[in-house]
Amino acid sequence: MVTTAEKTNIGYITQIIGPVVDVKFPNGKLPQIYNALTIKGTNEAGQQLNLTVEVQQLLGDNQIRAVAMSSTDGLVRGLEVVDTGAPISVPVGKATLGRIFNVLGEPVDNRGPVNNQETLPIHRPAPKLTELETKPSVFETGIKVVDLLTPYRRGGKIGLFGGAGVGKTVIMMELINNIATQHGGVSVFAGVGERTREGNDLYNEMIESGVINNENLNESKIALVYGQMNEPPGARMRVGLSGLTMAEYFRDVNKQDVLLFIDNIFRFVQAGSEVSALLGRMPSAVGYQPTLGTDVGQLQERITSTTEGSITSIQAVYVPADDLTDPAPATTFAHLDGTTVLSRGLASKGIYPAVDPLGSTSTMLQPNIVGDEHYNTARAVQSTLQRYKELQDIIAILGLDELSEEDRLIVARARKVERFLSQPFFVAEVFTGSPGKYVKLEDTIKGFQKILSGELDDLPEQAFYLVGDINEAIAKAEKIKG
């Protein structure tokens, strides 16, 4: 969505290089950096054009260089370009809930225009240091494995690492559902360089699970912003900012806790590197843009907690060729408060959510933040699982009977812990048939303490699989015995 300046400033196209367009303006009438320019009209072939470009550089001699937000097919030199006098602005507020937008804030879900008055520019400064919430607080998700082993920071940034089919989307949807029902919060989903099919699937799943209310859109709990894989790099580079702007409004004006999902943060960097060379910048390491750190920082620094509300961000991170030292994931790592790693091994065992309890980390798992009881329980769970992992080779070769009495006990408890880390999800009820469970943090800690203390050694391990709190596991065990 773009606004028009009162005194129209008109230039004309002098050069087109793929998604990059050069425009010449009259003397003393240059647009500012990040201003949106519109190109409308008809070209020589009779094609109707309606295109928005964003100013990136001032070249001198009254010329600017801009990046297009949609395809530049059909553009010719000499076409008129109008300076709107402002950056790209997107609709914000309650009217965005339940809708799908593109990078310009235009609805793309065939449900008509958005009836709201307020828009905000996508380029905004990060909150001032004095406005930030400095006391770290844990954000309860209701998912046992996350709350115990990788607690999320309110207003923090979490990286979600996982391949295809291990359950990234299901975890994202469960988090959206839980923040909506338990915290009364809203979510914004930014699909950056997503497959169109995935975006469509996600939208339909949101409707099925009730997160988007088709009858009354105002009751929905999420706004979706998509810049798909087939779109030019300009759109993929800016769609994250469009989603973030909508989230900032909920935080700053409505004073809410917001969840911001970005899938995939790597493709935001990739889009920047695609246009960087066309803008005449010298590439840096591995061909990435020299401004990589700044680009990532400008996005990440706006995702934070203020004294008014918080934006907690869950970002899917693609790791090129599994190389964690690649500049794109390495730069992202510097901003993350926690990493949730999904394991294909656990998924193949049928343990969902398939979060790797040993590979996932969080800066919040410290005794002075979460308390001694939580910290000690989490570390005891990890050391039990680590010992079980070490013993697996011996078990595979010699069998369980060759282990010492103590090790056999550790294995039995570790298998119960592993199963107790699984949990039925609300958003998966349709597929699993078992009702979803939200488990409070204190119940999670108590449950694992009971398993590790040996109190429940006589219960069968299948009683711990896909249950909520420990009382359900005990009830399930009695049913199995009975």
From Swiss-Prot:
Keyword Nucleotide-binding: yes
Primary location group: membrane
Keywords from the UniProt entry: ATP synthesis, ATP-binding, CF(1), Hydrogen ion transport, Ion transport, Membrane, Nucleotide-binding, Thylakoid, Translocase, Transport
Subcellular compartments: Cellular thylakoid membrane
SUPFAM superfamilies registered for this protein in UniProt: C-terminal domain of alpha and beta subunits of F1 ATP synthase, N-terminal domain of alpha and beta subunits of F1 ATP synthase, P-loop containing nucleoside triphosphate hydrolases
Coiled-coil portions: none
Protein's UniProt keywords contain Cell division: no
Binding site for ATP: G162, G163, A164, G165, V166, G167, K168, T169
GO molecular function: ATP binding; ATP hydrolysis activity; proton-transporting ATP synthase activity, rotational mechanism
Superkingdom, natural source: Bacteria
EC number: 7.1.2.2
Any one annotated GO CC term: proton-transporting ATP synthase complex
SMART domains per UniProt: AAA
Membrane topology listed for this record: Peripheral membrane protein
Catalysed reaction equations from the record: ATP + H2O + 4 H(+)(in) = ADP + phosphate + 5 H(+)(out)
Function: Produces ATP from ADP in the presence of a proton gradient across the membrane. The catalytic sites are hosted primarily by the beta subunits.
HAMAP family with a match to the protein in the record: ATP_synth_beta_bact (MF_01347)
Similarity section: Belongs to the ATPase alpha/beta chains family.
Binding partners and assembly: F-type ATPases have 2 components, CF(1) - the catalytic core - and CF(0) - the membrane proton channel. CF(1) has five subunits: alpha(3), beta(3), gamma(1), delta(1), epsilon(1). CF(0) has four main subunits: a(1), b(1), b'(1) and c(9-12).
Protein name: ATP synthase subunit beta
Organism name: Nostoc sp. (strain PCC 7120 / SAG 25.82 / UTEX 2576)
